[in-house]
A protein has these predicted regions:
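Extended beta-strand/beta-hairpin segments
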Residues: 1-53, 60-140
Length: 140
C-alpha cells in the first residue's frame, strides 16, 4: 500500500474564514484557499481545482501505462480535467477530461478503446462518485 497525505487548516466561518492546504511532498505548502477561491475568482486554490489536477495527472499516467501494455508509446498526452461543483447540491457532479494525444502507429479505434479503459480504471476516476466524460483527440 502507498499512502499519501495532505493537511488542511481552516480558521473562521465558512464564508469569511480562510484556510491553508499542505501536501506531504511540500509541492503545496500553506497554500491559501477560501470561500472566494472556491466560489469566485479569489487568489489561491480550492478543492475542486485540486481534484481536477489529480484526475488529469492520474488519467494521463494510467493512459501511458495502458498504451505501453498495448505496444505503443505516446509522444505526448495533454489531459485537462474540468471538475463541476453544483453549489445547490453541494457536490461534485462531473469531471470532464479533454485529451489531445500524439501516439505514433496507433489506429483511432485502438486509441479510443485504450483511452476509455484508462478513463474507467484510473484510480481517481474510481474514487469519484460523479459522471466522468472523455473527449479524446488523436493528433497526427
Amino acid at each position: 500500500m502507498i499512502n499519501r497525505k495532505a493537511t488542511a487548516v481552516w480558521k473562521g466561518t465558512g464564508k469569511e474564514g480562510t484556510g491553508t492546504v499542505s501536501t506531504q511532498s511540500t509541492v503545496l505548502e500553506n497554500t491559501q484557499y477560501s470561500f472566494n477561491t472556491r466560489f469566485a475568482e479569489g487568489k489561491g486554490t480550492n478543492p475542486e481545482e485540486l481534484i481536477a489536477a489529480a484526475h488529469a495527472s492520474c488519467f494521463a499516467m494510467k493512459l501511458s501505462f495502458e498504451l505501453n501494455a498495448a505496444g505503443f508509446t505516446a509522444d505526448e498526452l495533454n489531459a485537462t480535467a474540468t471538475v463541476t461543483l453544483d453549489p445547490a447540491k453541494g457536490q461534485v457532479t462531473k469531471s470532464a477530461i479533454e485529451l489531445k494525444a500524439k501516439v505514433p502507429s496507433v489506429s483511432a479505434d485502438q486509441f479510443a478503446q485504450i483511452a476509455d479503459k484508462a478513463k474507467k480504471e484510473c484510480p481517481i476516476s474510481q474514487l469519484l462518485n460523479a459522471e466522468i466524460t472523455l473527449n479524446a483527440e488523436l493528433l497526427s
